[in-house]
């Protein structure tokens, strides 16, 4: 175990009680351009067009093999651009249940997949964009091989969901995802948790961190365990994305469901962790749970302002 001694746990009232329930029906989702540094999108859709879950919305002109896909089926409500036509968001009004199916593999055959087969399925499904590189925090270039991959199964942000609770019924998918990550690197797949979290590392290499924020940040883990450099690239990925990767390969379907923590001093029902689709509008998720004063707002992730 590595203990972080310098840091700060921000004292904010209304911490979640770590009870998961289904959130309200998703009506609007968005894929945000600023989430992807250096993105030069080539659009595959236009406003008003119907899309299926898993359908390509756009690709990166600098890396055409990577697809950015729809997390839900529905109709493209708007494509929003900013200065110099930089993509701000693609907004989808959710309706219907059409979906694109991807390659399916029996769990017993996952270890027989080649690096190219794993990468191709991830890139076509849109799950490749869950990876980030260190340094530079960009989506990895197709064909690149990281020196190691870090799975962040710990969260030290204030009012965050407990990864152990979120993963409680998804251990098999999580371990399958870790097996698949092992096909993408010749180095270690690090699985980072809190001490005694009870989260299985599977075929990965387990390590634990304790202490205040930033004990849960991937940059902290990489710095202490397997430092990156300009010539040595490390990837990191979130634990819920690893579950989605495991389910993609064993079911052939894109898993876009995510659990987020909803808390804070203005929440009416403190402790709810709604389950909703990736990319859903936070205001739609939070509105039934909040009792806010005029002129005030609530943030789902305080330290990021989002």
Descriptions of predicted regions:
Residues 45-59, 78:
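Short, well-structured beta-strand-loop connectors
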Residues 41-42, 46-49, 65-68, 171:
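Short, surface-exposed secondary-structure edge patches
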Residues 65-81:
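Short, compositionally biased
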Residues 1-46, 59:
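N-terminal, Lys/Arg-enriched amphipathic/low-complexity engagement segments
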Residues 80-303:
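Buried, small/hydrophobic-residue-enriched core segments of structured protein domains
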Residues 52, 72, 238:
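A cytosolic small-molecule/anion-sensing beta-strand core signal
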């Amino acid at each position: 175990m590595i203990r972080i001694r310098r840091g700060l746990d921000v004292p904010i009232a209304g911490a979640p009680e770590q009870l998961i329930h289904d959130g309200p029906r998703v009506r609007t989702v968005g894929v945000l351009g600023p989430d992807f540094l250096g993105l030069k999108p080539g659009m595959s859709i236009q406003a008003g067009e119907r899309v299926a879950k898993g359908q390509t919305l756009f690709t990166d002109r600098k890396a055409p093999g990577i697809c950015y896909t729809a997390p839900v089926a529905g109709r493209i409500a708007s494509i929003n651009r900013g200065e110099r036509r930089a993509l701000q968001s693609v907004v989808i009004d959710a309706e219907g249940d059409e979906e694109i199916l991807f390659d399916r593999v029996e769990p017993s055959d996952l270890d027989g997949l080649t690096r190219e087969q794993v990468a191709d399925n991830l890139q076509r499904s849109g799950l490749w964009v869950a990876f980030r590189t260190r340094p530079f925090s960009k989506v990895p270039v197709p064909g690149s091989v990281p020196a190691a991959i870090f799975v962040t199964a710990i969260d030290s942000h204030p009012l965050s969901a407990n990864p152990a609770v979120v993963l409680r019924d998804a251990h098999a998918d999580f371990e399958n995802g870790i097996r698949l990550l092992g096909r993408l690197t010749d180095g270690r797949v690090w699985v980072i948790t809190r001490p005694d979290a009870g989260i299985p590392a599977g075929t990965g290499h387990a390590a634990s961190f304790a202490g205040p924020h930033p004990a849960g940040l991937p940059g902290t883990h990489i710095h202490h365990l397997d430092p990156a450099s300009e010539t040595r690239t490390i990837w990191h990925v979130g634990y819920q994305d690893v579950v989605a990767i495991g389910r993609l390969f064993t079911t052939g379907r894109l898993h876009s469901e995510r659990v987020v923590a909803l808390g804070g001093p203005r929440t009416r029902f403190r402790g709810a962790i709604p389950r909703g689709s990736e990319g859903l509008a936070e205001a739609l998720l939070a509105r039934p749970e909040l009792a806010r004063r005029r002129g005030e707002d609530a943030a789902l992730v305080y330290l990021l302002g989002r």
